[in-house]
Amino acid sequence: PNGRITRAEVATIFFRLLTDDARQRNWSSENNFSDVSADKWYNNAVSTLCHMGVLGGYSDGTFRPNAPITRAEFAKIAVSFSQANGSAVYSYFTDVKTTDWFAPYVTTAKDSSLIEGYSDGSFKPENRITRAEACAIVNRVLGRKPSKNHMKISGRIDWPDCTTADWFYEAIMEATNSHTYQMGKRV
């Protein structure tokens, strides 16, 4: 949970979260990145999400699929994917200036309750996002709220590196254990 997650992995996660209709309407296997060729396992995910405006690359024409993703980049993707509407740019965090490229996304993500900062008032936008942080944000994008009752299901998958004392325990359990779900609620 505390390990890094790559840009290609994040693209694949959000691609798989698309509805069948959205995936079909926006399907693309073409992109302009010099480092994402058609034969790569993540090509369709990257190409489709770029076509939708959810993902972007770098000014040098690369996507850097194997690079770890930052918290700022992940906030931008989460906001773009969820189509959350932003308001005026506000600096909720001590290390996010209103002039930073990511400030509008961080503001919108905070306003939409997609992200949280650290107890010291910072967001640490350039830090690599952890798998646990990414999981918690994806749950929020989908409106999935971990439930104490869900943690008691029979046949629950437990993970050796995820204990009940971890801040991310409920988020990981919510995301990795099967249950019937519709946007924003359990069924």
Where are these regions (language model features)?
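Alpha-helical membrane segments in multi-pass integral membrane proteins
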Residues: 131, 135-138
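Feature responds to low-complexity, polar/acidic, surface-exposed segments characteristic
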Residues: 1-11, 16-43, 52-72, 80-104, ...
